[in-house]
């Protein structure tokens, strides 16, 4: 088992190094080097990364790509706005049964939903119960501006099935955690994460006749709540 873990670390390290080569020599825009908790960078990103214009550019690129891949997004400031936005998304979609990850912010928002919702606890939730959920709520640790992709790390929260099984996935992402490229994002992924989930819009598949079907192998809809720091 030890040799297997060492081999996995070596492979992931090689992938990170190769993907980040293209990003060397340019400053990532609007991104803090790491975040142990959503929206709380652990280190100073430097003057170039802190510039509001640069950060605005990378957020704009990200939202443009979200729209291009069929995802929806809403900018919110603080937990109160996020709670209202979450309730609105679920109500508009007719989603009643909701499960949230173990991330503290997600737990706070899901537990605050009104009586019109059935709030499922992730702890002890059966496979059948998970498939009966209308929506799954998680955080995303990183966003990739080039492709409108969400990056979810296994070391940060229990979220993998919640982002894949329910027909609606709602992800909370700090605007300070949006990277330019996949290489930038992987350079910031926690070494403790054994699995990384990359989500680019709702699930899509097509047959040999190129008939596109949405939601067969994953969520039919992806909503991203972009959290900005309150002034």
Which residues fall in each region the model found?
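The feature marks the mature, well-folded catalytic cores of soluble enzymes
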Residues: 1-231
